[in-house]
Amino acid sequence: MAGAYDPSLPEVPEWLNKGDNAWQLTAATLVGLQSMPGLVILYASIVKKKWAVNSAFMALYAFAAVLLCWVLLCYKMAFGEELLPFWGKGGPAFDQGYLKGQAKIPNSNVAAPYFPMATLVYFQFTFAAITTILVAGSVLGRMNIKAWMAFVPLWLIFSYTVGAYSIWGGGFLYQWGVIDYSGGYVIHLSSGVAGFVAAYWVGPRPKADRERFPPNNVLLMLAGAGLLWMGWSGFNGGAPYAANLTSSIAVLNTNLSAATSLLVWTTLDVIFFGKPSVIGAIQGMVTGLAGVTPGAGLIQTWAAIIIGVVSGTAPWASMMIIHKKSALLQKVDDTLAVFYTHAVAGLLGGIMTGLFAHPDLCVLVLPLPATRGAFYGGNGGKQLLKQLAGAAFIAVWNVVSTTIILLAIRVFIPLRMAEEELGIGDDAAHGEEAYALWGDGEKFDATRHVQQFERDQEAAHPSYVHGARGVTIVL
């Protein structure tokens, strides 16, 4: 009697490698868990209490919206046949004949993976989703949720797919030899730059929120960060499209860089501020992960440690020192410092990949022969220049495309919540609160239209008192 896994069965074609398919689906699930529930939890807990529901919902909505757009149009824009040197021909990816066939990327010379196209479509969706959710981190606490709902599909179509096709889908940067092993440019540089631009156009949070924006639940924040870290093994381990040597090296290098960067960031906090910070440790973790992503499977382990050190130092300095000296950086209110933790770290990681990419590891993954980092001589100097040029293209495209998208949305929908809603938060935006505690005193009445000066008068002559344990009692 034929077994359940008999190769002759149509469900198990001859080209299917069950180990590769199982690992790729596992990696996709790990990356998906980074967003759902990882970033949902992290965003909900790292913000001020009144923005917990709104922040979580922005991530939740993006995850769902990206999946639908991805299958209907965007997968083929990023990994389909060429339309332009930086863009693929869009189209639906839900035909069963297409999804059951062997995975392939038409315009690249990557060996066809030994799993179905359905696996590849879903795996790449999880990357598109987390990139879009990262952009949200820059505008938490003031962006109009309706504007965000319009922004997500437009940014996915006109920004993300361009970077993905250009570098991963066989576009001009791929053919030229720019290295981005698993998304230092496509994901982290693009989301950081786009988030910064979005924060500029949406405008800053209210002054009270900018001056005091404590996390509402540090322990949940750590839980979300933990899911993000552990999920990164699928993020970088799944990039080779196989359960092979490169994936093993990538997983080890990923975790080593994250640990190193976290410890470096924490050490700097202790040296300069006298005590370690949980938020700082999480930021260091993220910069280490983002920094190693462009070359995780292409560098030796000692290089991963160096990348961790640089990723824990340079973004810290840019956030703590350069930010305070730049009028532009101070003007733009990047709520979760996505520009520093993702754009700066991703850029540095791409540059360091141009230095440390090992030729013996590059030959296992990359399209061009004799690819190597500058540290190994040969044509490594040219590789470093390619890395810089690739970063410039991704950054400029995201500045232009994100600006155009937001200005177009602004014609129809305000990018920013009304001032009264900004003072109230979740209850105004969603009619829901994260913690339904009696006496919080932040209730939205849609029939009232209180101007800012009236709220200032209320603050001067409050109609409430603080009871035991800080509970606000409305009089």
UniProtKB/Swiss-Prot annotation:
Note whether Transport occurs among the keywords.
yes
Q: Name one GO biological process term.
A: response to nematode
Phosphoprotein among keywords: no
A single MF term (Gene Ontology): ammonium channel activity
Mode of membrane association: Multi-pass membrane protein
Q: Tell me, what's a Pfam family for it?
A: Ammonium_transp
Give a brief account of the tissues where this protein occurs.
Answer: Higher expression in shoots than roots.
Localization per record:
Cell membrane
Locate the transmembrane regions by residue number. 27-47, 55-75, 120-140, 148-168, 183-203, 218-238, 254-274, 279-299, 302-322, 336-356, 389-409
Any Gene Ontology CC annotation: plasmodesma
Tell me the keywords, alphabetical order: Ammonia transport, Cell membrane, Membrane, Transmembrane, Transmembrane helix, Transport
Give the residues annotated as coiled coil. none
Q: What induces it?
A: By nitrogen deprivation in roots.
Under InterPro entries, the record lists:
Ammonium/urea_transptr, Ammonium_transpt, Ammonium_transpt_CS, NH4_transpt_AmtB-like_dom, RhesusRHD
Its domain of life reads Eukaryota
| Cited function | High affinity ammonium transporter that may play an important role in moving ammonium between the apoplast and symplast of cells throughout the plant. Does not transport methylammonium.
Q: Which PANTHER family does the UniProt record give? A: AMMONIUM TRANSPORTER 2 (PTHR43029:SF38), AMMONIUM TRANSPORTER MEP2 (PTHR43029)
State the family named in the UniProt similarity comment for this chain.
Belongs to the ammonia transporter channel (TC 1.A.11.2) family.
Concerning NCBIfam families, the annotation shows: amt (TIGR00836)
Q: What is this protein called?
A: Ammonium transporter 2
Which species is the source of this protein?
Answer: Arabidopsis thaliana
**Which gene specifies this protein's sequence?**
AMT2
